[in-house]
């Protein structure tokens, strides 16, 4: 079973790491090509393109300039411990055991606008480049055109290597659009998380993101190997709703959270 998640905008390069192990990303030369395109942008261009503040734009102009094709523990850190958004709050990677980190290294992948696809222990230099960014590049006018079938082909290799025919999609729509379902040699299962608010169950972004991380953690800790076992997910009060689920979409609900 292979899991894909989105990356995060918030990064952490300060917290002590729970492991000294690391690996290298698979698409460094492709990332370098994107960096080359990014270096043509001024901070003003970046602010407009990414819809970010001047401060964040300036920070990322510096990051693009300092980015190197040599990844070391001095200029990078394993991706799983560098991302700090809502998904990663739920995943809580720093509390995983060594054997759980090893399992994640085989079964968890992070989609990325700059790096394409990252393994948990892949060294990652800090960046901001969301998959939906309309960045002109040598392969097209956006990152979906840039990555083409590369990410899907890599996922197929990973699935074949572990003898799995199931991909669990815990990524956002923006990121999963970088995967080509028709070319993927696996069944795609997408968990959906709905929270009750004012008597209605709906997808609430903040809760849904955290729930995706909780589900990834649940799979890693329990070494889940089939879809049936996913249905027993019950972290933070979520429960499986058979009547609203299909073979490809698993619906989980949760009662209203006290404020």
UniProtKB/Swiss-Prot annotation:
Organism: Aliivibrio fischeri (strain ATCC 700601 / ES114) (Vibrio fischeri)
NCBIfam families cross-referenced by the UniProt entry: PRK02101.1-1 (NF002541), PRK02101.1-3 (NF002542)
Annotated protein name in UniProt: UPF0246 protein VF_2109
Annotated Gene Ontology cellular component terms: cytosol
Residues passing through the membrane, by range: none
Source superkingdom: Bacteria
One of the GO BP terms on file: response to hydroperoxide
InterPro entries: YaaA
Family the UniProt entry places it in: Belongs to the UPF0246 family.
Top-level taxonomy: Bacteria, Pseudomonadati, Pseudomonadota, Gammaproteobacteria, Vibrionales
């Amino acid at each position: 079973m292979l899991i894909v998640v989105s990356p995060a905008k918030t990064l952490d390069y300060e917290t002590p790491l729970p492991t000294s192990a690391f690996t290298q990303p698979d698409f460094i030369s492709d990332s370098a090509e994107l960096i080359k395109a990014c270096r043509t942008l001024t901070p003003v261009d970046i602010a407009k393109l990414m819809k970010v503040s001047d401060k964040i734009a300036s920070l990322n102009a510096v990051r693009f300039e300092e980015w190197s094709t040599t990844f070391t523990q001095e200029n990078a850190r394993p991706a799983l411990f560098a991302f700090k958004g809502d998904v990663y709050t739920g995943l809580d990677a720093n509390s995983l055991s060594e054997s759980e980190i090893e399992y994640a290294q085989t079964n968890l992948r992070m989609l990325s606008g700059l790096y394409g696809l990252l393994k948990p222990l892949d060294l990652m230099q800090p960046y901001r480049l969301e998959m939906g960014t309309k960045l002109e590049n040598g392969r097209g006018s956006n990152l979906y055109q840039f990555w083409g079938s590369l990410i899907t082909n890599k996922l197929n290799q990973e699935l074949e290597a572990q003898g799995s025919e199931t991909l669990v999609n815990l990524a956002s729509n923006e990121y999963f659009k970088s995967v080509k379902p028709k070319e993927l040699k696996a069944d795609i299962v997408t968990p959906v998380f709905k929270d009750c608010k004012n008597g209605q169950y709906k997808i609430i972004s903040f809760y849904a993101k955290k729930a995706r991380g909780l589900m990834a953690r649940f799979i890693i800790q329990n070494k889940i190997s089939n879809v049936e076992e996913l249905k027993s997910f019950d972290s933070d009060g979520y429960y499986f709703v058979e009547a609203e689920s299909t073979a490809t979409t698993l619906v989980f609900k949760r009662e209203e959270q006290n404020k």
